[in-house]
């Protein structure tokens, strides 16, 4: 798979299919099956699978242009492909050879979509408060789960769930690979979460009450018991670049809306863009976008190279890009004034979507605390 060809195909898909339809999808809170099928057919869900497991073996940096362009259409689409990318990173970096052979070729072929689940009602960024448990089956078959999970990305129709749980035999959480064939059955209740923005993409809540999953196992096998938090945070380096690309796509659209207002909206004898204050706002949007873009590109390269700085850079890129996205939408909305408050207006949707990037893959304030911690402890 040529990354440039992928980007070109995504650009055409966004222009021809997404932009003409996104207002209706957002209003109806739907991601049509055909659209998700198209994302799979484009190769976006299996792009990170290595060649020796049947995938194209692309890196995160290869996907930045495609993720960004997809987000110019709708960030929900970029979010829809993200959990399977996280699962791929988990399997490639931490899976046993048997787990890799079981799942990666099917992800590459578009036969399997995954979910990623850390958050619980009482535990978001504080992984030490995880309460979901997984005990060994009575005859040593699989795991028995109890507990609750929230904000399970892709958690309604995925084929496999990677979730953080306290597993019998370890004093720290482990990453459980949970086939989803039992979802909705005995001991596994499902509820879909209605959202203000970031609509269409699945966000689920789970309740486990003694759910026996014969095929469930610990990622990396028993040797990796207690390593789940480290494994899943490692994969989130990939996810934070994905979220940062969502933010870049929002910034791109906010800038386009601002330019349209400046050149199309008549003010007195001229247009809005004739006024210095409007030009200053557009110029600042261009400057801040360039800074966010450079940081995202640098972070993606660091994640691919497994640099020591990858965690810090991917976190910083996500924080800076998402804060810039919310800021840029606000600035564009000020230029558009009442137009941006009308139902169905693109800026009205962006106002609802942009804050998701400040929350997804870690709330920004929690991430800033994590960035500060090693520097303060080393002082």
Task: Label each region the model flagged.
Residues 41-101, 105-110, 154-160:
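Internal helix-loop-helix
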Residues 86, 336-379:
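Glycine-rich phosphate/cofactor-binding loops in nucleotide/flavin-utilizing enzymes
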Residues 19-27, 263-270, 286-320, 330-341:
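C-terminal helix-coil-helix/basic helical segment that borders enzyme active sites and/or dimer interfaces
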Residues 110-118:
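A short, Trp-centered hydrophobic/proline-enriched beta-strand micro-motif
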Residues 142, 148-189:
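A short core secondary-structure module
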Residues 6, 72, 190-289, 357:
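Glycine-rich beta->alpha junctions and the first turn(s) of the following alpha-helix
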């Amino acid at each position: 798979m040529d990354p440039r060809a992928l980007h070109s195909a995504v650009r055409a898909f966004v222009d021809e299919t997404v932009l003409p339809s996104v207002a209706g999808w957002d209003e109806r809170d739907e991601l049509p099956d055909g659209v998700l099928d198209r994302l799979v057919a484009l190769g976006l869900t299996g792009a990170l699978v290595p060649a020796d497991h049947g995938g194209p073996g692309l890196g995160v940096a290869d996907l930045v242009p495609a993720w960004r362009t997809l987000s110019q259409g709708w960030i929900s689409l970029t979010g829809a492909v993200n959990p399977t990318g996280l699962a791929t990173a988990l399997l490639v970096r931490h899976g046993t050879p048997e787990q890799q052979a079981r799942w990666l070729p099917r992800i590459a072929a578009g036969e399997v979509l995954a979910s990623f689940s850390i958050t619980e009602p009482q535990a978001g960024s504080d992984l030490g408060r995880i309460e979901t448990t997984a005990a060994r089956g009575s005859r040593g078959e699989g795991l028995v789960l109890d507990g609750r999970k929230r904000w399970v990305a892709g958690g309604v129709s995925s084929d496999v769930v990677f979730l953080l749980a306290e597993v019998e035999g370890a004093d720290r959480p482990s990453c459980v690979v949970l086939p989803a064939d039992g979802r909705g059955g005995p001991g596994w209740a499902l509820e879909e979460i209605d959202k203000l923005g970031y609509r269409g993409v699945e966000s689920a809540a789970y309740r486990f009450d003694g759910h026996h999953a014969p095929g469930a196992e610990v990622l990396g096998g028993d040797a990796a018991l207690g390593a789940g938090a480290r494994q899943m945070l490692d994969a989130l380096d990939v996810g934070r670049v994905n979220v940062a690309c969502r933010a870049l796509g929002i910034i791109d659209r906010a800038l386009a809306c601002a330019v349209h207002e400046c050149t199309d909206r008549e003010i007195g004898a001229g247009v809005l863009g004739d006024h210095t204050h409007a030009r200053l706002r557009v110029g600042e949007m261009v400057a801040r976008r360039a800074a966010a873009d450079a940081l995202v590109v640098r972070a993606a390269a660091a994640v691919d190279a497994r640099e020591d700085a990858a965690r810090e850079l991917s976190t910083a890129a996500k924080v800076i890009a998402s804060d810039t996205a919310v800021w840029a939408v606000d600035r564009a909305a000020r230029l558009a004034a009442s137009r941006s408050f009308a139902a169905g207006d693109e800026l009205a949707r962006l106002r609802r979507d942009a804050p998701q990037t400040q929350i997804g893959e870690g709330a920004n304030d929690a991430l800033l605390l994590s960035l500060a911690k090693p520097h303060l402890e080393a002082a």
